[in-house]
Amino acid sequence: MKKRLLASLIALAATPLCAKDLTILYTNDIHAKVDPYIARYIDEERAVGGFANLATYIKQEKAVQPESTIVLDAGDYFSGSTVDTLTEGEAIIDIMNTMGYDVASIGNHEFDYGWDNTLVQLAKANFEILLGNVFYEGTDKPFWDKPYTIVERDGLKLGIIGLHGKFAFYDTVAANMRQNLEARDEIEYLQKYLDELRPQVDVTILLVHQGTPARQSSLGNNDVRRA
């Protein structure tokens, strides 16, 4: 399912900051496309993408500003190639571990092989994984134990939050793959984590895997802006 996703700069702290350069590179819905492929909506003849090309670009950008570049992903790195299917996502994490990613959130396709597999494979990542609003059903026990992280780049403290849209979770994750899990309102949890982070950081960044009914603009939907 095609989805709009948001990796957005949510807020600057009220304290005045000295001008600094910060480069944020982010991907979403890379769907295990390890090799370049024909994406007809981009080019009907020329193959595009591929993890090697992406890794090269990340390496080049980090070489320019190594102290002020951060690389993020907003989910759906699983599901879309044979190697992913055969390894249930393990090979994708292995490759992403070599590409220079710093932080990623979890999308619906990371649940395609069952949530128990999600836990097993994502635990192998050498970059941070975030998800803050999916819980074991009927409890306050989070499915993933890290809703946000604080990363420093060139003297700036960045608070990064990972969420999954509630509608998108129920609409796109097969019922048998999310059994005994529940997603809760992302706006409520966004506000909670913003309140916790703002006293500690200079900038907050949201990685959210969210469906098209949210109708977000390039700045995010109205609820996100209000938060």
List PLM regions with ranges.
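Acidic, metal/ion-coordinating pockets
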Residues: 19-227
